[in-house]
Design a protein with these regions (language model features):
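Short beta-alpha junction loops
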Residues: 10, 172-181, 216-221
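A structural signal for short, well-ordered beta-strand segments and their strand-loop junctions
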Residues: 6, 50, 142, 168-171, ...
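Extended, charge-rich low-complexity interaction segments
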Residues: 32-50, 196-216
Length: 294
C-alpha cells in the first residue's frame, strides 16, 4: 500500500517533472486565465466584431476561457480555427464569432509565451519527458473513473504504454455488449466502447500488446443484492425486450403530473419526506431531469 499513489494527470506531471529535473513555467489556474483574458479583451477590443459588447458582461470571460481551454484539449489551433471559419462562410454570424475567438486565442497564447503554462499544455510537456522517468519504467498505471480521454490525454497514454510496466484502464460495460465495436455515439455504452477502440488503436500504433480483458460481471450486483426490481430495471432499461417484472415491488413508483410545476412539487415533497422521516441526507438523493429550463 505504501507504494500506491493516487494522482490526477496534473499531479503526475509535477511528480515526473521533479524526478527528471524538468523546469517548467508556472501553471496558470482558471482565475489567472480569466484575468489575462480580461486584459487581452481590452487590448484587442478594436479588433473584436461580435464579442466586443459581451466581454464585460458578468460571467462571459469565464465562458470564453472554457472555450479556449477546450481548444487546447481537443487540438484546435489557429489553422483549425481558420478551417472552421471557411466552413461557416463569411455571411454567417458564426464566422465572426470564430474570428473574434481566433483574435483572443492568438493574443492569449502570445501573452503566455515564456511566462505561464496552462493545465491543458501541461500534459504535452509531460509527454516530452516520460521516456526519461525511472519511476514510470517500473510502474503499473491504473486509470479508473474516466468516461473517455481527450486527444492530449491519448497522446500521453501512448507514451505511457511504451514506458510503463503495465497500464490498466477500467471501463463501464454490460456483459451483453461487445466492447470492441463502436458504431455511433447514441448506442448503449458508447463512451466505454469509444474508449476501448481508441486505446486499441493507440496500442497498435505503438506496437504494444493488449491482454485479454478482465470482466467483472458477477450477478447480482452488490448494490442490488436486496433489490431485485432495481436490478431488473438496470438490466433492461433502454433495451426493447418483452421481459416484464412480475413480482410485487415498491422500489419503482410512477407519478403522473398535470404540469412541470406539480411534478417538481411532488419530487421536492418526496425528498423532504425522506430526509425528515427516513433518516436520509440530501447528499444521498439524486434528482434527474430531462430539461432544467422547463
Amino acid at each position: 500500500i505504501m507504494n500506491i499513489d493516487v494522482l490526477s494527470f496534473a499531479r503526475l506531471a509535477h511528480r515526473i517533472f521533479e524526478e527528471v529535473g524538468q523546469s517548467h513555467r508556472a501553471v496558470l489556474d482558471d482565475e489567472g486565465k480569466n484575468l489575462i483574458l480580461r486584459k487581452i479583451a481590452g487590448d484587442y477590443e478594436k479588433d473584436l466584431k461580435v464579442l466586443k459588447g459581451n466581454m464585460k458582461k458578468l460571467g462571459y470571460i469565464s465562458e470564453v476561457k472554457s472555450v479556449l481551454s477546450e481548444f487546447d484539449q481537443y487540438d484546435i489551433g489557429e489553422e483549425e480555427l481558420r478551417q472552421m471559419k471557411v466552413a461557416a462562410g463569411e455571411n454567417s454570424r458564426l464566422y465572426y464569432k470564430l474570428q473574434d475567438l481566433e483574435v483572443l486565442y492568438i493574443g492569449f497564447k502570445k501573452y503566455l509565451e515564456d511566462r505561464f503554462i496552462t493545465k491543458e499544455e501541461l500534459l504535452d510537456a509531460l509527454c516530452r519527458v516520460v521516456k526519461g522517468s525511472d519511476i514510470l519504467k517500473e510502474s503499473t498505471i491504473v486509470l479508473d473513473g474516466f468516461t473517455g480521454f481527450t486527444p492530449v490525454q491519448n497522446r500521453l497514454l501512448g507514451e505511457l504504454l511504451e514506458v510503463c510496466r503495465e497500464v490498466i484502464v477500467t471501463v463501464t460495460m454490460d456483459d451483453r455488449e461487445n466492447p470492441y465495436v463502436y458504431k455511433h455515439p447514441y448506442q448503449l455504452f458508447a463512451l466505454g466502447k469509444h474508449t476501448v477502440t481508441s486505446l486499441i488503436q493507440i496500442a497498435a500504433e505503438r506496437k504494444v500488446s493488449v491482454e485479454d480483458p478482465l470482466c467483472l460481471y458477477e450477478r447480482p450486483l452488490y448494490r442490488f443484492c436486496d433489490n431485485s426490481a432495481m436490478e431488473f430495471l438496470e438490466r433492461n432499461i433502454f433495451r426493447y425486450s418483452k421481459e416484464c417484472y412480475k413480482e410485487k415491488q415498491g422500489a419503482v413508483r410512477i407519478h403522473v403530473a398535470r404540469n412541470p410545476r406539480e411534478e417538481a412539487m411532488k419530487a421536492a415533497g418526496r425528498v423532504r419526506n425522506l430526509v425528515r422521516t427516513k433518516g436520509y441526507r440530501y447528499r444521498d438523493i439524486g434528482v434527474i431531469v430531462s430539461n432544467m429550463e422547463v
